[in-house]
Amino acid sequence: MAGTILEPGQIEAAASKPPFTNLPPRDLFALRSARLAKLAEDHPLADYLRLLAGVCQAQQQVLDNPPASAPLDPARTRECFKHAMPPLAADTLVREGAWLPLLDAWLDAFAVPDNLSVIAAVDQLRRADSGQRKAWAVALVSGQYDSLPPALVPFLGAALQLAWTHWLLQLDLSDLREREDQTLCPCCGAPPMAGVIRHRGQLNGLRYLVCSLCACEWHYVRLKCSHCRSTKKLDYLHFEGSPQGIKAEACPECNGYLKQLYLELAPDGESLSADLATLDLDLLLADQGYNRQAPNLLLAPGHEA
């Protein structure tokens, strides 16, 4: 069988080249739940973090035992890979109904706390028909937060994360094409929630962006704005002594910022929970004129404090 002969330098380059994408672990939501519960200790937003720990726990329960639902279309997936398009394109799949059974399963799994606002939000989501649910979901993934009730965001967002992560873990990404300056998730097209700076092995010192929807990680060079791609005068803002290992990469060109989790500073850190535990940093950045560009689907807009 014919093959390609690699020269010595090419062999070393191929062996040392880091992976373009990293899949989330299958216990992702359990890890998030445990981390949120830990961060809630002595935290001013303890009740909120514990609520979201329960949200993530229900996500893991359904991910471990997913309901019967329509499988991914292999022909469409192949075409997406062929044309370098996201195989789990959020703006398309969210308008279809394959994710709705996972929403229902999550609603059944979630242990609703004794909180009137949470009870009302979950009940509103439970009673909504499929058309209304899809309309809200389209608004959420497209960033049109004024088009859905803010109280629904963490719960609808949890179901969408669950569905897309479930699908992502079924994919073989070997045919996914690497592209430079990829500011949106190569698997689903959603924006990143945060960046994570690795600190071990082959990935030491590399930055990966973490998808806000499916939790795929993809390589993106450091010292470059993940929104406008500028490399000019980026600033890194953080609170001294913060145990979460979070710094915000702030860009004066677009006035946006993205939080970065440095695992060297917080080896047990996890990006979603670290983001939610450092909302005081968001307030500081807002006071300095920076705008948050990265969505966190468990965070209702306007409820950063």
UniProtKB/Swiss-Prot annotation:
Disulfide-bond pairs as recorded: none
Superkingdom of the source species: Bacteria
The species this protein was found in: Stutzerimonas stutzeri (strain A1501)
Gene Ontology, cellular component aspect: cytosol
Listed GO biological process terms: protein maturation
Principal location class: cytoplasm
Pfam families: FdhE_C, FdhE_central, FdhE_N
Record CDD domains: FdhE
Transmembrane recorded as keyword: no
Entry's localization field: Cytoplasm
GO molecular function, one term: ferric iron binding
This protein's UniProt keywords: Cytoplasm
Biological role stated in the UniProt entry: Necessary for formate dehydrogenase activity.
Protein name: Protein FdhE homolog
Entry's family note: Belongs to the FdhE family.
